[in-house]
Amino acid sequence: MANSSTKNDPKIYSLLSIGQRGVGKTVFLIGSCIELYTNQYQENGQQLWFDCEDPEIQQTFEGILRQVAQTGQYPSATMKITNFDFTLKLRNLWGNKTLCQFRLWDPPGESCQIYNPAFLMMVLNSDGYCAFIDACTIVERANDPKALAQTFELVKSIADMLHSNNLQHPLAIVLTKCDRLRFDLQDGQILEQGIQPLQTFLEKLEVNYQIFYSSIPIVATDDGFCLKTSEAATPILWLMSKLRNTDIFSLNGDIM
């Protein structure tokens, strides 16, 4: 949970990555970091970026990017719980400021079960959540209410837990692999209709949530392949804004 060693130190938030095996959690995190490492988030003379001083994490990311560049394939599913520690920093007219630090837990999909005591403890000890659902799966199951309900089961369990414990922790729901949808065949409309039952459920419980659409395709380059990102880090920035009770880009010289 959020903590700080002194009043003036930036808070440290714990975020939990939730989703079934192969849904695209690790690719999302890599895509988010690519954007914020390359300073793509700029507005009104302000600039945001992630900073990571852990050499092991840097080596992990570099290894994944090399694999993508050489093979044109996504990384294999995560086999063990991985912690990623980052600092979110801002540069503006007043100089550089550390907004906050966060640790993102990225457990393997098979351990993301609400009846798993270790996973349950991670849920209760987290400050915010990124829940991942395969957009193509929603479209494929749109005409099968029972199968569609199973797709949302984990997210609904988390929402139930938040509601029963009277918690307003933010929940970012990331619909992955949207670049694979066939919009010429109305997959977009089918997707919107498919997520309606989940939205109705979350709103009934008054969960603090937002839905995001993620597209991180692999594209060919002169040097091989790379991940193509566009606003991939928006869900994490939204979580940071909610946890800090401020718009990330509405900050002036006085940073909370």
Which residues make up each language-model segment?
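Switch II (G3) loop of P-loop NTPases
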Residues: K97-P117
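Conserved beta-strand/loop subsegment of P-loop NTPase cores
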Residues: Y129-C130, A159-D179, P197-Y213
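Inter-motif core of Ras-like GTPase G domains
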Residues: I114-D144
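Conserved nucleotide-binding/hydrolysis micro-motifs of P-loop NTPases
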Residues: G109-E110, C136-I138, C178-L181, P217-A220
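Canonical P-loop GTPase G-domain recognition
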Residues: R180-I248
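Conserved G1/Walker A P-loop phosphate-binding module
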Residues: A2-T78, R91-F102
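Acidic, glycine-rich loop-and-strand cores that form catalytic or ligand-binding grooves
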Residues: P55-E56, T176-R182
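Amphipathic helical hotspot of TIR/SEFIR-family domains
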Residues: R141-N165
